């Protein structure tokens, strides 16, 4: 069962919510990175650019992600906070598919030019924070 969404108006969310675009950074097979391999995340960020867990708790349904890949339909999911404090992207609300883990997302700063790691099915990949925009 894939993630389902109800419409949310930007005006219903706190001003801390941002749209964050993460693009694949340079790695073997992608010496220039790849703008087409990306994630677009909607999440509350604190003044330092870190995910605000308190606001996430209050507005968790609004914390969404879209997984972008060339020639593949976009996958829509949610940003989830797991027991122990780790963050992940989940696309399957029934829990049958594995989540994509954000490596140290709780410590990462989501500001343009910074890098974050995401564990996908084939291992960890570095993504560059390409843009952070207010809603």
Regions from the PLM with identified roles:
Residues 1-57, 67:
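N-terminal intrinsically disordered, low-complexity, charge/repeat-rich segments that act as generic
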Residues 6-9, 38, 72-78, 114:
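Short small/polar-residue motifs
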Residues 10-14, 79, 108, 118-121:
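A general structural signal for short secondary-structure junctions and capping/turn motifs
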Residues 13-17, 34, 72, 82, ...:
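A generic structural signal for short, non-catalytic loop/turn and secondary-structure boundary residues
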Residues 19, 86, 115:
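Exposed beta-strand and adjacent loop surfaces of beta-rich binding modules
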Residues 22, 39-43, 76-81, 127:
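Broad, structure-driven detector of short, well-ordered beta-strand segments within folded domains
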Residues 56-109:
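Short, conserved turn/kink motifs that form compact alpha/beta structural patches or helix kinks used as
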Residues 90-135:
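Short, compact, well-ordered microdomains
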């Amino acid at each position: 069962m894939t993630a389902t969404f109800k419409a949310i108006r930007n005006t219903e969310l706190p001003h801390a919510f941002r749209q964050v675009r993460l693009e694949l950074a340079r790695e073997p097979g992608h010496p220039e990175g790849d703008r087409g391999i990306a994630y677009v995340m909607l999440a509350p960020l604190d003044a330092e650019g870190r995910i605000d867990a308190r606001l996430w708790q209050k507005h968790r349904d609004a914390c969404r992600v879209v997984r972008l890949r060339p020639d593949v339909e976009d996958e829509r999911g949610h940003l989830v906070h797991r027991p122990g404090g780790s963050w992940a992207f989940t696309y399957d609300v029934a829990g049958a598919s594995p989540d994509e883990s954000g490596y140290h997302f709780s410590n990462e700063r989501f500001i343009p030019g910074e890098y974050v790691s995401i564990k996908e099915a084939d291992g960890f990949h570095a993504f560059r924070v390409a843009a952070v925009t207010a809603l």
